[in-house]
Amino acid sequence: MLSPVTPGELLKEEFLVPMGISQYRLAKETGIPAQRIGQIILGRRRVTADTDLRLCRYFGLTDGYWLRAQIAFDLEAEKRRIEPELDKIVPVQRAIAL
């Protein structure tokens, strides 16, 4: 099973590399600290609302694009982590029918 894609991987592989944009340039042109961008790309920091709005404006995306990517990553990672516990939960409708 493939690991979920972090927003940082998405940023680097789908935006920065193909567009030839450096992390330094992104930082300078968006006002996002370079250290924050680096940490997001390495998967050591989550995307915040501030970062989302700045990246969305810069890349011409709908507000929330990066936050949705962060939430999708978080949900998939957590689901994998607690899958055995989730498998033990009986949905309420099935529990009532039993």
Whereabouts are the PLM-identified features?
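Short, charged recognition helix plus adjacent turn
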Residues: 68-98
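Residue-level recognition of specific faces of alpha-helices
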Residues: 7, 36-39, 57, 65
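Short, basic-rich loop-to-helix N-cap that marks the start of a DNA-contacting helix
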Residues: 44-57
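The DNA-recognition helices of helix-turn-helix-type DNA-binding domains
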Residues: 33, 44, 73
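A short, Lys/Arg-rich alpha-helix, primarily the initiator
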Residues: 1-21, 68
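The alpha-helix within a helix-turn-helix
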Residues: 16, 27, 56
